[in-house]
């Protein structure tokens, strides 16, 4: 008991000497934190032995002493690392190396030169908030190298420069939603207005926000909308003239067209092409061509794929088929329709030459109904849409792959229960990844722990890396690390099972190759 009291009094004397000397050296600050660590360890030991008071000093609970000891150890490690940098000979005070300054925004950095910044919300002087802008910010990169950066303020917030990158540690728009109602604020530095009142929806270049959309910019938008609606009406009224003069088949579609106007436009184009082609046919095929043109123009509205085939083969796929087969939609056919189709086939047979008839016979015209049934089956399967195929019992997983998903996969997927189409769609996608951002040591610890605890839930980890400024070699932002996976299901299982460390952010992505 007496030995603990004597040691505690000796540590108190050392702390008083440090405070009275007020040395502005980094070595004195390291000594100060080492003394605080010894004091916390001594109080922890005394509480563990059941001692509740050392002289006039009450002994706190063990959790408090443990927290203070860990805090002192962390500050000693930071200051010893700073002592090996180029900034060790700068003046450092007790305030500069205190935990309050170290934990204030931007958190985890040493800071000097506080400057008050006043922000007035809603143009109300009583509704103002004070912020601290630090003149200099000392931060460590992924290579444990210290850098000194200047801090600044603009209408977006308070930031410090990492090369040419502005790292904001205070955003005024976030507090404008909390303290204000109109979303407007005014920035003052040393009682001088630096930026006039701006709104939270209009700061240009604000991270995570849209471009300027103030009141003056909204007026032209309204007038443009009115002009667009007027032009849409004029376009609808002049639609027949446009369809006649338009010669290109795949012209650009106007965004304001409705589905009904698009269908009418396709029908008018089909009638125009069918009439121009029917004039160039031979006189012996006049009746056949006219009936084919009528059937072709009628079936245009249903499907474009069948229309293109009927146009190239000179017959309608929905009313008359060569092999006497049935229509894909209607299973029965009236006798009049069957007789008209028989008449048309006989007329075409008389008009065709023997050479054409022989060439067509080589493709399977013999066998009549059987050959027509085979050709009809091939046409219906090729012209049906993927959605129609899936509705017949296909797997819902066989969806199309967007252009952004196409890439080189690292492994060949299994063809079990998917078929050839499902295999191609799965192989078209890019390998998935997860990018994590945080402190370099935290990411390294997370990688080592995941390799042991989550084996089989990932493909590989990358080393920690950082972005580099375009005009220099200085690192920007926090360190990053990539985690690759063999499939999206593996990434989902990994994301559900893993626990990310505190202060680590994640994002999903995919790459063409690894």
From Swiss-Prot:
Gene3D superfamilies: 3.30.70.330, E2 (early) protein, N terminal domain, subdomain 1, Papillomavirus E2 early protein domain. Residues 248-284, 323-333 have a biased composition (Basic residues). Signal peptide: none annotated. Residues 213-231, 285-299, 334-343 have a biased composition (Low complexity). The keyword Transcription applies. It is found in: Host nucleus. The keyword Ligase does not apply. Phosphorylated. Belongs to the papillomaviridae E2 protein family. This is Regulatory protein E2. It comes from Human papillomavirus type 5b. The gene is E2.
